[in-house]
Every structure is written in structure tokens, then in C-alpha cells.
């Protein structure tokens, strides 16, 4: 059961609505049932560092219908957590939802209750974030705060206090480890993709620091009170492009200097339209105290971790997961070789590449 997340007064304000006509039409081709969107508002939200906000809004998408046992507990909830600065809706694409959410597929939405939240602070989402108005006065949240916000949304908003499955990608993968350690009774199984169960350090942290400093050290940042996006955000997005790269694929798709240059220019131009500097900095800094290594033995969930050799963020050659995952009972680790189907860090969007391992995990649960 979900315990109360610290001592706070939370009031659920649910505003459920069907997705837009365009979204519903697109989702109809990808899922067994259409998605619905809603918002949950928690009052007097306290952050781990002592800061607080009078209220936070958590936006979410749900697909399917909750099923309850005789005690009223939801038995078919699947929570899917997105990566840094994304939103829950990023999974509603053919390569993910089209492979998993349809009739007869592994996460058939007519069987499971799928929950896709926009995480606290995430720039592309509709949940509360710095760019809503507080800018650099926004509380300096971390992953524990983000998990707390989602747990409140689940328990007090959607009346879900138990997860059949947590699917976590990138940041969501890291949060999965933290969640299963701090609240081991919450989650039956976790399908985790593109992360490592150890402190963000080495090259991973160095790149995060470079991106954060690209923005914060730009005079145009003005301590977060800029009137236009600081130029340093462009450099930060450039760093992000490199670490998110899929070298084998990109060599094939952009085989000339002109093609590569055009891709970079298009990528920067498009991402500058949707990225806010404060949102960006806050999200990447939220990993600053992530370190699940010491408590892996507390995890009770069945765990499947899948990484790829072409993931710049989480290099497979370091052997971290092979050494650490055995500490978590009922855990498995798979390191995928580089193929024409892998996409570097973002291989998690290509469900066809790893869905057989999800199937194995569900088999352990008896489906």
C-alpha cells in the first residue's frame, strides 16, 4: 500500500477529459482503447529540501480501465515513466504504443490500466514546472520529489495504491530503482530501460554539468530571469544531441557532411522552439543525488533492466549493471548488441527490440 508521502495535506482535483479529436484518432490506431487526459492538484506540496509550493498540478494520460479486487485494490495498473524533460504522451507513437498497447499485445490496453504521467518540472509536459512563472524561484526538486508527486497523483487522484508493473525509461528507469527501494511494497515488477543502478558520476555527470553550465554561465541567463532563451541553451542542446546519438544509424542516415550539418541545424532549431532554459537546467540537475547502489537489496519487485551497447549515457563496457544487479533479488540484466534496430540511448522507444524481455518478465508474474 502507498504510505502517506511525508506529512502534507493533499486535495485531489481531477479534471478528466477525452483527448483531442486528433489525438484520439491517432491513438485508436495504436491502442486497444482511446486515451483520456486529466489533472490532479495537490495542495501544500513539501519538497525534500524544505521548500514548498501552495499547490502542484500533475497532468496524466490514462488508457484502459482499472480492475479492482474484493478489497477494492486496483490489480492491473501499469505506470510508464518518461525521461528527462519529456512528457507521458511521448509513448503514444507506433514504435512504442503500436507495439505494446494494442489488442493481444503485451500491454493490451483492454486488459491493463495504463498510466502515463507528465512528471513534475518536465518541460514538454503540462505538470507544474519552472517556466509556468516562478522561473529560478521554483523549488529545487530532485528525483525523490518527482516520485512523491506521482505517488500522490496515483493514490489520491486515481485511487491506485499498487502497481502491477512500472515501465521506466532513462530518468524514469532511475526513478524506478529509487521507488522500489524506498517503497518496496508498491510495485510487483519493473521493466527498466536505459539507465544504471549507480550514482550519476563519471562521463554521465560531466555531460550534465556541461549542459547546466552552458545555460547558467551564459550572461543572457540573468540568474533565470531572462526575457528570451539564453544562447547557452543552444550549446546545451548540442551536448544533448551527442550523448543521445546512435552512431551506426546516423552514419547510414547522414553519410555526408552536408546531411549531417542539416540534421544538426534542424535539430537545434526545432528543439529551441519547445525547450525552456530553466526547465532544462532543473530537470538535469534533479539527478544530483541519485544513488541506488547501496539499497538494491531492499527491492522486492521482479526487475528486468535492458541497456544497449550504443548508449552513450550508460556505457555497456563498464560492467556496472552486471556487478550490481545481482544485489536485487529476482532481477535480470540484458545488454543488447548494436544492430540496425538499436537507437542508442533512445532504443527504449523501439519496443520491438526489447519486448521479448518484457514478455519474460510478465511470465514471471503469471501474466
Task: Show which residues each predicted segment covers.
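N-terminal cap/lid subdomain of alpha/beta-hydrolase-fold enzymes
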Residues: 61-131
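Alpha/beta-hydrolase-fold enzymes
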Residues: 186-270
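Active-site nucleophile elbow and catalytic-triad environment of alpha/beta-hydrolase enzymes
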Residues: 279-295
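Cap/lid segment of the alpha/beta-hydrolase catalytic domain
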Residues: 101, 105-157, 203-204, 208-222, ...
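Conserved alpha/beta-hydrolase "acid-adjacent" motif
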Residues: 312-318
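Conserved hydrolase catalytic core segment
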Residues: 162-201
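Catalytic active-site module of serine/aspartate enzymes centered on a nucleophile-bearing elbow/loop
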Residues: 331-367
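Short beta-strand/loop motif that positions the catalytic acidic residue
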Residues: 299, 305-307
Amino acid at each position: 500500500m502507498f504510505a502517506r508521502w511525508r506529512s502534507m495535506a493533499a486535495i485531489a482535483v481531477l479534471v478528466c477529459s477525452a483527448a483531442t479529436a486528433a489525438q484520439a484518432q491517432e491513438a485508436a490506431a495504436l491502442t486497444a482503447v482511446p486515451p483520456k487526459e486529466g489533472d490532479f492538484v495537490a495542495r501544500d506540496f513539501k519538497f525534500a529540501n524544505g521548500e514548498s509550493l501552495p499547490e502542484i498540478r500533475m497532468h496524466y494520460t490514462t488508457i484502459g480501465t482499472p480492475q479492482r479486487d474484493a478489497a477494492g485494490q486496483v490489480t492491473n495498473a501499469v505506470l510508464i515513466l518518461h525521461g528527462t524533460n519529456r512528457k507521458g504522451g511521448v509513448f503514444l507513437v507506433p514504435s512504442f504504443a503500436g507495439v505494446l498497447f494494442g489488442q493481444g499485445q503485451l500491454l493490451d490496453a483492454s486488459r491493463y490500466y495504463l498510466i502515463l504521467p507528465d512528471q513534475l518540472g518536465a518541460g514538454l509536459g503540462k505538470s507544474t514546472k519552472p517556466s509556468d512563472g516562478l522561473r529560478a524561484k521554483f523549488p529545487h526538486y530532485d528525483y525523490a520529489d518527482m516520485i512523491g508527486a506521482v505517488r500522490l497523483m496515483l493514490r489520491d487522484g486515481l485511487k491506485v495504491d499498487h502497481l502491477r508493473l512500472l515501465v521506466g525509461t532513462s530518468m524514469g528507469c532511475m526513478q524506478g530503482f529509487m521507488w522500489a527501494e524506498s517503497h518496496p511494497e508498491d510495485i510487483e515488477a519493473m521493466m527498466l530501460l536505459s539507465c544504471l543502478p549507480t550514482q550519476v558520476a563519471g562521463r554521465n555527470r560531466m555531460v550534465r554539468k556541461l549542459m547546466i553550465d552552458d545555460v547558467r554561465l551564459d550572461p543572457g541567463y540573468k540568474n533565470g530571469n531572462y526575457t528570451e532563451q539564453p544562447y547557452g541553451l543552444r550549446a546545451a542542446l548540442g551536448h544533448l544531441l551527442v550523448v543521445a546519438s546512435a552512431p551506426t544509424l546516423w552514419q547510414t542516415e547522414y553519410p555526408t557532411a552536408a546531411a549531417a550539418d542539416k540534421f544538426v541545424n534542424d535539430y537545434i532549431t526545432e528543439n529551441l522552439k519547445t525547450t525552456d532554459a530553466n526547465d532544462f537546467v532543473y530537470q538535469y540537475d534533479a539527478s544530483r543525488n541519485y544513488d541506488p547502489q547501496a539499497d538494491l537489496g531492499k527491492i522486492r519487485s521482479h526487475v528486468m533492466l535492458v541497456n544497449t551497447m550504443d548508449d552513450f549515457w550508460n556505457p555497456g563496457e563498464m560492467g556496472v549493471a552486471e556487478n550490481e544487479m545481482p544485489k536485487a533479488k529476482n532481477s535480470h540484466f540484458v545488454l543488447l548488441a548494436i544492430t540496425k534496430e538499436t537507437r542508442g540511448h533512445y532504443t527504449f522507444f523501439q519496443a520491438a527490440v526489447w519486448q521479448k524481455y518484457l514478455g519474460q518478465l510478465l511470465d514471471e508474474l503469471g501474466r
